[in-house]
Amino acid sequence: MERIKELRDLMSQSRTREILTKTTVDHMAIIKKYTSGRQEKNPALRMKWMMAMKYPITADKRIMEMIPKRNEQGQTLWSNTNDAGSDRVMVSPLAVTWWNRNGPTTSTVHYPKVYKTYFEKVERLKHGTFGPVHFRNQVKIRRRVDINPGHADLSAKEAQDVIMEVVFPNEVGARILTSESQLTITKEKKEELQDCKIAPLMVAYMLERELVRKTRFLPVAGGTSSVYIEVLHLTQGTCWEQMYTPGGEVRNDDVDQSLIIAARNIVRRATVSADPLASLLEMCHSTQIGGIRMVDILRQNPTEEQAVDICKAAMGLRISSSFSFGGFTFKRTSGSSVEREEEVLTGNLQTLKIRVHEGYEEFTMVGRRATAILRKATRRLIQLIVSGRDEQSIAEAIIVAMVFSQEDCMIKAVRGDLNFVNRANQRLNPMHQLLRHFQKDAKVLFQNWGIEPIDNVMGMIGILPDMTPSTEMSLRGIRVSKMGVDEYSSTERVVVSIDRFLRVRDQRGNVLLSPEEVSETQGTEKLTITYSSSMMWEINGPESVLVNTYQWIIRNWETVKIQWSQDPTMLYNKMEFEPFQSLIPKAARGQYSGFVRTLFQQMRDVLGTFDTVQIIKLLPFAAAPPEQSRMQFSSLTVNVRGSGMRILVRGNSPVFNYNKATKRLTVLGKDAGALTEDPDEGTAGVESAVLRGFLILGKEDKRYGPALSINELSNLAKGEKANVLIGQGDVVLVMKRKRDSSILTDSQTATKRIRMAIN
């Protein structure tokens, strides 16, 4: 009170007022504080002070022609004084109001295109559904998440080239647009942004948002796809969560999801083939996801998932240095170990050869539903701190950690024999044998582990062998925590090697990934996955195998028919016929194959008995190793639609139906394509097969009389020449060979020579 009174007295004296308003502020420290550097020291004050002035805003001089001096109310809009230090004029805030109401309008057509990501976000939020708020402890763990929905997956460099090309096409500088996505996006954006008046820099920023994946390392409990991350601040706090369903999906999330499904399917299929690595590469290169080549997506997409990483490793791309075991991602945070082979006895006295890691190590374990910190020594678990969504998830993490520790009591807890096999019927390695065993039933493991009394530590509780929580006792070395363990944040990628059985190792030889680690979870892909490889035909069931096999023969008929006559064994061994074998009853495979191969040989030997449709129909049956038997068949059985269906050796059936009039083939009622040539037995389509034993001399020569039909050829004597009508009404001159030994080469040269003779 005293101070205020004193100030009042001072202010009543005119001298005080004069000192405060008229004298300069000349204390150097104060001047320095407020004038050094470009950074505004007190923005709020500055703003208030500026706006209190009559003309706080500067504008380009041209504004004087475009805006009246006074508005309708007679208030002055701009002053004649120039802005100090620039050639701009000072204007009133009222000028802005006038401009907004009466200024020139411009086309808004480009706004939704440039600010596409914002417009789409508004739509998603408009159609999203917010549910109730729940108050509960949130176990958040930091994960690397995509914060920018609706982007393409270009690298920063690729995006930079696209942006320069779209926004500043006339700037100098080498720009190389190589990838398909770069070219497509550039073309599309150039068309969209023709005559765009929005500031180029703004357009460039917005394009960057659309083209590049931006990731942040954020604490998340719940969904990690970008449409959930964009509302993270609305859906989870420290002690609450709000249910939310996004009002739309974005392509980048769909690509990530579909990529994982495609990769899992491919790895699973490759595992059971003769050469897994070669098959995997063949499938990755021939698969498309949402119309984009899978290999292009793999090169650009940073998704880290076991199957995806195996595919990347096979392509020679770098992957994360963490390793996977039991569906958890392990990252060593300290310590080191050396590997040594050791033989151990299970509780069933079965001998296992395990590679023991000797030394003290610490790991973080991160799974979909649980995370943990693990400290271990040689074959001993020292401490495991787990957190998870529920009892089940916590139990999964504990089992994986117990097996990983390689402790003796874990190995002794095995009851019964370990004989788990993978999809290719090969025995799993010992560590995965143990894992599968305890994942099936961990009762004995938990009972034998041992328990210990625990201290009361904030945020930690014990867990008993029956997986119930306790504050007094806990499984030895194991505690449950309320806090999650963060995912490994580094985006560092390392060079890895992969062997033909798809085991991925780092440069020190540690196994990071193997097909055993690939999840068996089946999902439905959001984008269409097109597997062109014959190895994936069976993914849609037996019918698809049947249709695809016949489609393949028809598509490749030109080369197939030449091989059929010249190198049948190579044709029979083609991998495209592999899936078909699973449709033929096991007992019949060898017999069918022997029968069909004999039939084909007769066709090759007897002129004019060639039958295109029959060859196409029976070819897949010749692929199995043949059994020599005298058996004849009038129909062959295939297992589709849950039962055996018959394919007639001569004639049509519901399974294989060739329509002579339309020249189209239908397999199980589905169109399998058209035969481009006339499969009429008389003038057989495969000239090369028919003209064995004849040498093609060239174009028609009238001196040798009228053209004979193929059937009349057999009457020629050795060395005799004749004109022959072949295929599509073309005539060529042939000579019957003097020796039979050279017959094999005929069909090879025949095909080439017919073409030359006709053309």
UniProtKB/Swiss-Prot annotation:
A motif (Nuclear localization signal) lies at residues 736-739. InterPro entries: Flu_PB2_2nd, Flu_PB2_6th, Flu_PB2_C, Flu_PB2_CAP-bd, Flu_PB2_middle, Flu_PB2_N, INV_PB2, PB2_helical. The record marks 627 as: Avian adaptation. Signal peptide: none annotated. It holds the Pfam family Flu_PB2_7th. GO terms for molecular function: RNA binding; RNA-directed RNA polymerase activity. Its main location: virion. GO terms for biological process: 7-methylguanosine mRNA capping; cap snatching; DNA-templated transcription; symbiont-mediated suppression of host gene expression; symbiont-mediated suppression of host mRNA transcription via inhibition of RNA polymerase II activity; viral RNA genome replication. Influenza RNA polymerase is composed of three subunits: PB1, PB2 and PA. Interacts (via N-terminus) with PB1 (via C-terminus). Interacts with nucleoprotein NP (via N-terminus). Belongs to the influenza viruses PB2 family. HAMAP family: INV_PB2. This is Polymerase basic protein 2. The gene is PB2.
